[in-house]
């Protein structure tokens, strides 16, 4: 269960206490990229259950840059490749395509 502790004025960042499901599940609940949350909090590893961290909502739309691959986009947002493709009803990505992040 998520304990929302504080919502920043810009509504893009907020503070949560990591619930029993763990850090990755908490990121999924808030559509946040795990690697970005770790960096945002200045951590070297995933926070443990009970830790209080700043979360940031991920962008819901992403424009594919010419140098990006499906793998790199999915790693950035912490989603599976099949998830991203299925969510957007596509079978591949191409430069300047706009995709919605699940």
Model feature map: region roles:
Residues 1-3, 36-39:
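Terminal low-complexity, poorly structured segments
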Residues 38-42, 83-88:
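Short alpha-helix capping/helix-loop boundary micro-motifs
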Residues 99-101:
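Solvent-exposed segments in extracellular or luminal domains encompassing
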């Amino acid at each position: 269960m998520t304990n929302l502790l504080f919502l920043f004025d810009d509504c893009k960042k907020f503070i949560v206490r990591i619930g029993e499901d763990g850090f990755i599940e908490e990121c999924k609940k808030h559509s946040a990229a795990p690697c970005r949350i770790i960096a945002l909090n200045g951590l070297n590893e995933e926070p443990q259950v009970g830790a209080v961290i700043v979360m940031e909502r991920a962008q819901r739309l992403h424009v594919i840059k010419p140098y990006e691959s499906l793998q790199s986009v999915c790693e950035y947002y912490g989603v599976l490749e099949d998830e991203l493709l299925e969510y957007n009803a596509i079978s591949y990505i191409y430069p300047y395509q706009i995709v919605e992040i699940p």
